[in-house]
């Protein structure tokens, strides 16, 4: 991915080119996030800002150092929120919005999304776009998570939010 700048990582010939490129992208991303946080601090915004980082897929190195694409695992990081919590179970992207509302104490919103806040509900499963349930397939939320994909698809494709 561009526009990262080559660093000494690019010349580390003990690693395959694909691994070096991956490390360059990670380095570039880390620098950009650092610059963003520095900008928040220098403009006096940091103390009143919740930083949320989410991905739509995962591009991790396997234990053998081989890059691989994974669309069932993704990062979700919330920083500077005043809440310390580590979620080690499965959750879906659909749970991000309600979780962020919870983190920011915006619980008076009329619409809380289609998922669940991981701070309030023990989410142990997530549904994929194709109806596959990840995590605990017997989770009581699983059928609703599958239904939420259908609702989400209809909202997006049927112009639910379009202006008339």
Language-model-detected regions and their locations in the chain:
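Feature representing long, continuous alpha-helical segments
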Residues: 20, 24-27, 31-35, 74-76, ...
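Active-site lining segments that contact anionic ligands and/or coordinate catalytic metals
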Residues: 48-49, 71-74, 124
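Structural recognition of the beta-strand scaffold that forms the well-ordered cores
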Residues: 52-53, 77-78, 126-127
């Amino acid at each position: 991915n561009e526009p990262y700048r080559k660093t000494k990582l690019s010349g580390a010939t003990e690693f395959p080119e694909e691994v070096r490129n991956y490390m360059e992208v990670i380095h570039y991303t880390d620098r950009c996030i650092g610059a963003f946080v520095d900008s928040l601090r220098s403009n006096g915004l940091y103390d009143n800002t919740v930083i949320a980082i989410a991905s739509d897929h995962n591009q991790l190195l396997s234990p053998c150092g081989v890059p691989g694409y994974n669309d069932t695992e993704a990062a979700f990081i919330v920083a500077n929120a005043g809440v310390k919590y580590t979620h080690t179970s499965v959750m879906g992207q659909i749970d991000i919005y309600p979780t962020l509302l919870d983190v920011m104490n915006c619980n008076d919103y009329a619409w809380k999304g289609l998922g669940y806040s991981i701070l309030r509900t023990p989410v142990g499963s997530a549904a994929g776009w194709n109806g596959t349930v990840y995590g605990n397939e017997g989770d009581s939320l699983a059928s609703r998570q599958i239904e939420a994909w259908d609702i989400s698809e209809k909202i997006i494709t049927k112009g639910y939010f379009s202006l008339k």
